[in-house]
């Protein structure tokens, strides 16, 4: 029996292969277009864990839906299943065994989607939209962590309707990341908190934000021993901070860099500055991708402090991105991110998810 049982997809399968996709201004990088993309802005993407054979991609959208595709080695995408919330879906994640998907929504709930039965049940409740959701697999417990605009961080045993633990946040949760045994939560008013997850979740440290503007996205990175050691934090001001938790030399090791800005440099040609909508670290090389409201993605080597690549400009913002478990596929979503308000929203504009074979482009530069 397949992972999805006998569930049917929600569209026709695509036929394009890696390297043979057509191009125009919506796809200047000639990347593979995922078939049957959502009908409204795409807020989150997540690939299946290495425990599952093959690659499955999940996307959540402002059309209140969560969709799943199988991504074949050829690059062909096959729609597999779909679930609904009653509000926009703001975040998605997988269980470590790949059997469940967890979804967070503006409807103030989080759900657990069992892929084999294609059934989704509510597992969490907040007093405001749920902005982030992460699965935590510890030696002595497993739970789902939800962060909300109600200024709480809640931890849920999926078998109970009451949270295992509730931690108060200084402000609304804007973004978060988890790599056991570390969690990072960034809030409104530039709040930044690191949690340790061993034994049970607890606050480890509050950090003064290295960025002067609103937090937009955060991603934890690992050291050469595969342990979480710091994070990258992106803001609406076209800037990313690289921050180590316990660096030997904080003043030297922690730094920020500008990105997702136009080429203007002076008063005669002012620079346009765009939000960093997403950050993802390559699972093998430790290099990173950023995507922005300027409609570009960029690849970076944080250790060499160099840019590896910047894409051509798409005709709308890139709202989310992720790598598959071995780093061979880079997925990014092209859709309106609401950075210019409702008056710039065009409901006729199609939303896209693209897949790029980026294994070579993310390799670190050879040290001279």
UniProtKB/Swiss-Prot annotation:
This is mRNA export factor RAE1. Residues 15-34 are annotated as: Disordered. Interacts with NUMA1 (via N-terminal end of the coiled-coil domain); this interaction promotes spindle formation in mitosis. Interacts with NUP98. Interacts with MYCBP2. Interacts with USP11. The keyword Cell cycle applies. One of its GO terms (cellular component) is mitotic spindle pole. One of its GO terms (biological process) is transcription-dependent tethering of RNA polymerase II gene DNA at nuclear periphery. Disulfide bonds: none annotated. The modification Phosphothreonine is found at residue 229. WD repeats lie at residues 37-79, 84-114, 125-157, 168-206, 215-255, 271-301, 310-346. It is found in: Cytoplasm; Nucleus; Cytoplasm, Cytoskeleton, Spindle pole; Nucleus envelope. GO terms for molecular function: microtubule binding; RNA binding; ubiquitin binding. Belongs to the WD repeat rae1 family. Gene3D superfamilies: YVTN repeat-like/Quinoprotein amine dehydrogenase (2.130.10.10).
């Amino acid at each position: 029996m397949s992972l999805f049982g006998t569930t049917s997809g929600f569209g026709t399968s695509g036929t394009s292969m890696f390297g043979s996709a057509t191009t125009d201004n919506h796809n200047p990088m000639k990347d593979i277009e995922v078939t049957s993309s959502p009908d409204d802005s795409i807020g989150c993407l997540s690939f299946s864990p290495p425990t599952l054979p093959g690659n499955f991609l999940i996307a959540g959208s402002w059309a209140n839906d969560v969709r799943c595709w199988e991504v074949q080695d050829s690059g062909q995408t096959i729609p597999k299943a779909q679930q609904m919330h009653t509000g926009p879906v703001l975040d998605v994640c997988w269980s470590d065994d790949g059997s469940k998907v967890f979804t967070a929504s503006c409807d103030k709930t989080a759900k657990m989607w069992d892929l084999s039965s294609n059934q989704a049940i509510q597992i969490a409740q907040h007093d405001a939209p749920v902005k982030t959701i992460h699965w935590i697999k510890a030696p002595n417990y497993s739970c789902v962590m939800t962060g909300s605009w109600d200024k709480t961080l809640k931890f849920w045993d999926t078998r109970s309707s009451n949270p295992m633990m509730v931690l108060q946040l200084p402000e609304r949760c804007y973004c978060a990341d988890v790599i056991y045994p570390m969690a990072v939560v960034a809030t409104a008013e530039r709040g930044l908190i690191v949690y340790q997850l061993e034994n049970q979740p607890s606050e480890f440290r509050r950090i003064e934000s290295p960025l002067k503007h609103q937090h937009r996205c955060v991603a934890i990175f690992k050291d050469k021993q595969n342990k979480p050691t710091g994070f990258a934090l992106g803001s609406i001001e076209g800037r990313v901070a690289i921050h180590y938790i316990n660096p030997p030399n904080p003043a030297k090791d922690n730094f920020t860099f500008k990105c997702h800005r136009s080429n203007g440099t002076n008063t005669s040609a002012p620079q346009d500055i765009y939000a960093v909508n997403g950050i993802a670290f390559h699972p093998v090389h430790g290099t990173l991708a950023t995507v922005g409201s300027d409609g570009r993605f960029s690849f970076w080597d944080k250790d060499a402090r160099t840019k590896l690549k910047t894409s051509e400009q798409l005709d709308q913002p890139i709202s989310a991105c992720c790598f598959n478990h071995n780093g061979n596929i880079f997925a990014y979503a092209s859709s309106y991110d609401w950075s210019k308000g409702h008056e710039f929203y065009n409901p006729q504009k199609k939303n896209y998810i693209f897949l790029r074979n980026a294994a070579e482009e993310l390799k670190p530069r050879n040290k001279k």
